[in-house]
Every structure is written in structure tokens, then in C-alpha cells.
């Protein structure tokens, strides 16, 4: 791809201290496969005690997407240097989870929720000593990652205090979709949304950020979900960006969200 200049230069590498990226590999008992995630640690501070954001990519991508095309680590380095945010860590997992079914492997995006809660969060937080409690933990994702985020935070509101839904969906448009769900399940009944009926739902989260591009191919679905958000009385920060279903929207989404959380 061609690297175009960034107007605010937040996604461009500058001569400042930079954080580190570490690739972690583990054998998952849930997917029965070797899995991986990337950990970003900010520069010049110990990892112990830091807040951590669990950040998910979209359909067809992988755990490297947020730091290659997304430039998330560069954006955070620059925001930290500018004093716009307090340092926090990132954990970026492969959300295209492949489940072994006989001799074949099939996509099962739903497994990520269990893998995060039962394997990735305990493993990462034990090793790096960040997070450790709801107040120091958030989750965000783009497109498919927004589906995984919404399902996870609705099922486990006790684990996260910050939520980012980029080009995002609160309904799962993958499970049971013959074009996307390789597992071949029946359409999902969106049972996770019942969590939003809890009178205390808004008290669970400091930030509930939902956004999309004004030329996104899924904009109509996003607007439909406005009504669900309003009906359930969810307190959200909502923003429409110029652009489509691509990184020209997701980088600004992430940049803005990073300045809202862990304050």
C-alpha cells in the first residue's frame, strides 16, 4: 500500500521514545490450536499497574493489523509524548479463530470471547502485571471486532470499564450468516443485548463509544442500531467520521477513543 501523509501526524513515526511490541504464542484448550496475540507496552514506564485495552481487528485480518495498517502503537506513542493521554498497554488477539472440526478447520469468531476471558486476559495480565481489575481494563474493536467486543462486554460487564465499537455493530451479523459464518450455525438471536436492559448497565462503563464512517457500506445497519441504543437507554458517545469502511476512519476512531479512556 502507499503511505499517505497524516494531517495531524499522529500516525507518523517521529523522533520520540517508542513503545515495544511483543508477539506471544500459546496452545489454546478452547480452539485446540496454537494461538497468538501482540502486546504493546508504552515507552519509559514499567508495565506493572498500567491500564490495558484489548483491541480487536476486523473480518479477514489478524492480530498484526492494528500495528501495521492501523498504526495504533505509533498513535499512542505520539499521544503520550504530547501529553494527550496517560500511558496504557494494548493486547491485540487474532479474532479469526479457527476451530478444528474433524480433519477440517472452520471459522468460529464466537470462541474469541471465551479465549479472552479464560486464557488471554489471565495469561497476559499475569506476565505483564497490567490491568488486574475492571477499572484498568477496556475492550474495543472494528467491524467483526466490534461484534466480538459487544458480545464480550455484555456477557462480562464486570471485567471492562471502557468500550469502543468502531464501524461497529451491537448486533452479531456474522453468526448464522452463510456468507461469513463458516461454522454453519443458525441465525443468532442476539441474546447478549438483554444485558442492556439491566438498570445498572450504564454504571458498568466509563466510556461507551460507537462510531462509523459516513460512506460506510454498513451505515444503514448502524443507524438501525441507533434505535436499539435509544430504546434501551444506553449512554453513549456517538460520532460519524468522513469516510468508508476502512482505516481512514478507524485510525481517527482509535485516536479519539484513546483520549477518552482511563482518565
Feature-to-residue mapping (PLM):
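Non-catalytic cap/lid and distal C-terminal segments of serine-dependent acyl enzymes
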Residues: 1-263
Amino acid at each position: 500500500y502507499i503511505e499517505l501523509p497524516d494531517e495531524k501526524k499522529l500516525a507518523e513515526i517521529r523522533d520520540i521514545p517508542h513503545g515495544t511490541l511483543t508477539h506471544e504464542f500459546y496452545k489454546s484448550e478452547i480452539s485446540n490450536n496454537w494461538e497468538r496475540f501482540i502486546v504493546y507496552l508504552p515507552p519509559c514506564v514499567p508495565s506493572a499497574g498500567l491500564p490495558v485495552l484489548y483491541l480487536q481487528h476486523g473480518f479477514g485480518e489478524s492480530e498484526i493489523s492494528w500495528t501495521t495498517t492501523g498504526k495504533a502503537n505509533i498513535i499512542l506513542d505520539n499521544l503520550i509524548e504530547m501529553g494527550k493521554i496517560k500511558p496504557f498497554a494494548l493486547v491485540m488477539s487474532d479474532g479469526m479463530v479457527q476451530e478444528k472440526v474433524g480433519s477440517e478447520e472452520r471459522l468460529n469468531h464466537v470462541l474469541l470471547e471465551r479465549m479472552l476471558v479464560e486464557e488471554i486476559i489471565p495469561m497476559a495480565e499475569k506476565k505483564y502485571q497490567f490491568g488486574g481489575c475492571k477499572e484498568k481494563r477496556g475492550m474495543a474493536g472494528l467491524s467483526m471486532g466490534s461484534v466480538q467486543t459487544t458480545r464480550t462486554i455484555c456477557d462480562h460487564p464486570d471485567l471492562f470499564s471502557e468500550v469502543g465499537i468502531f464501524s461497529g455493530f451491537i448486533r452479531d451479523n456474522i453468526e448464522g450468516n452463510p456468507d461469513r459464518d463458516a461454522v454453519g450455525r443458525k441465525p443468532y438471536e442476539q441474546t447478549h443485548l438483554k444485558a442492556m436492559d439491566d438498570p445498572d448497565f450504564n454504571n458498568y462503563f466509563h466510556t461507551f463509544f460507537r462510531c462509523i464512517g459516513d460512506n460506510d457500506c454498513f451505515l444503514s445497519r448502524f443507524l438501525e442500531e441507533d434505535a436499539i441504543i435509544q430504546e434501551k437507554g444506553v449512554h453513549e458517545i456517538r460520532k460519524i467520521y468522513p469516510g468508508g469502511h476502512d482505516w481512514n476512519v478507524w485510525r481517527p476512531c482509535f485516536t479519539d477513543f484513546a483520549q477518552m479512556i482511563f482518565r
